[in-house]
A protein has these predicted regions:
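Buried hydrophobic packing segments
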Residues: 15, 38, 145-149
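Short, glycine/charge-rich beta-strand/loop segments that flank catalytic centers
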Residues: 25-39, 52-60
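GST-like fold's C-terminal all-alpha helical module
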Residues: 47-241
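N-terminal G-site helix/loop of the GST-like fold
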Residues: 1, 18-19
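Short, polar/flexible loop-turn hinges at active-site or ligand-entry regions and domain interfaces
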Residues: 20-28, 156-157
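Short, thiol/selenol-centered motifs that function as redox-active sites or metal-ligating centers
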Residues: 1, 13, 35, 134, ...
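Single conserved hydrophobic/aromatic residue that forms the stacking wall/gate
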Residues: 2-14, 242
Length: 243
């Protein structure tokens, strides 16, 4: 079994062993390692950017807060506008400005998202999924921020439509995919067009995880992290990382 770094990935390994005909983990151990790495980066790094687009801009904040107010706070006897204000303040304080994204660094945060879209769009222009004609655990990792955030919320969705149509096609293809009906396998080796993603992981995400580990060891619930010209202050640690 490939080395995994969190409980979520352990569960996926167990699922893969029990359902070999629906495998999402490459049998090649090198492929599997890099697929797990992409899955972790996609799921644990990009949620902050997703929350920024959801709650920073008025269009996204009104869209999300109304949905949450109607779904989660329906039993509370308050006007819908009051529930929306509460939710917007709560989410911004907890997940955007309250988690290190400020007016000083949001330009770079958004540029990084555009860079991600550009890299993914080139990949999905050549093939259906990250490692070939079959979805892998890496695709599942990216489905988290894309299914529920980037391709759902109005602001990032419009950016994807304009800048990365192949990514939007991938979202639809992955959603409709039935593993038991796919006879194609993963490509051999590591596709060259994944290199920009791994470069970004090495330059930003791995140092971020290292700072995260130090915070866990020191029992600090928040930590500071700097990358490029961004200074994340009081970022929350990821408690499921295994040291």
């Amino acid at each position: 079994e490939p080395h995994v770094v969190c409980r979520r990935q352990r569960q996926m390994c167990i699922r893969d062993r029990n359902l070999p005909e629906k495998s999402i983990i490459p049998k090649n151990p090198i492929q599997a390692f890099f697929a797990f790495l992409l899955e972790d980066w996609a799921d644990e790094w990009w949620w902050r950017t997703a929350m920024h687009y959801r709650w920073h801009y008025a269009e996204g904040a009104h869209f999300a807060s109304r949905h949450l107010a109607e779904e989660l706070l329906s039993s509370i006897p308050l006007p819908i506008w009051m529930k929306k204000i509460f939710l917007m303040r709560r989410q911004r304080n907890g997940y955007t400005t309250g988690d290190g994204i400020t007016s000083k660094n949001l330009k770079t945060v958004e540029e990084d998202f555009l860079n991600l879209l550009n890299n993914l769009d080139k990949i999905f222009k050549n093939r259906k999924f990250l490692f070939g004609s079959r979805p892998s655990i890496a695709d599942i990792g990216f489905s988290g921020p894309f299914f529920r955030h980037f391709a759902l919320d109005p602001v990032p969705l419009e950016i994807i439509r304009q800048k990365a149509p192949n990514v939007l096609d991938w979202v639809s293809t992955l959603w409709k995919a039935r593993l038991s009906e796919l006879s194609d396998d993963f490509e051999e080796g590591i596709p060259n067009d994944l290199e920009p993603l791994f470069k970004e992981i090495g330059q930003v995400y791995l140092p971020y995880l290292s700072a995260n580990v130090q915070a866990v060891k020191q029992n600090n619930k928040k930590f500071d992290f700097e990358f490029k010209d961004v200074s994340l202050r009081k970022a929350r640690f990821l408690s499921l990382i295994h040291i």
